[in-house]
Amino acid sequence: MVALSSNGYFSPDDYLELESRSDVKHEYIDGQIYAMAGTGGIHNIISGNFYMALRSRLQNSGCRVYFADLKVKLKEGRRFYYPDLLVTCDERDAPSQAFVNFPRVIIEVLSESTEGFDRGKKFQDYRTLPSLWAYILVNAQQYLVECFQRTPQDFWLLKSYEGLEAIADIEALNLAIPLAEIYATLNLPALVDEVGMETDLT
């Protein structure tokens, strides 16, 4: 991510106003606004596959799945992030809002440039959301999905699913999705050997 300005402070309201008129997505961290670069093809296919898998399973559940363009509000408005996908089952998260306050599940498709942030500081911030039950990381270099599930004791339990034969159990939504569905149409080993790991900045 690249800071929009290294000088001065933007209030949350400043950020939301600027973002409503911007053609480029930005994240907001403690008064600074950071531009986000576009994603690559592998990233988009994985995100789209996961969105379709969730949407088809959640249609009559009262939960909604959002894809890429909806922010999550954190730290009482001091931070706003754009996850690749999120699911909210809280009626207070109206579809007309520009951001979600009560996500149940957040999903990030990993890229080489942001994997450290997604696993580290961003996950640390997401864990402050009482509504969040699961944080899911999807690898774009190999067939691997990591599900971090919050326990009743407020610990986070990791379950990893590897290989196209595996089925990811998303307990927070009471559903399971085969990795073959998440990675549909992708031959990752061949693609990674050909072009290397994608370097988008989402």
Curated annotation (Swiss-Prot):
SUPFAM superfamilies: Restriction endonuclease-like (SSF52980). It comes from the Bacteria. Gene3D superfamilies: tt1808, chain A. To Synechocystis PCC 6803 sll1609 and sll0925. This is Uncharacterized protein sll0925.
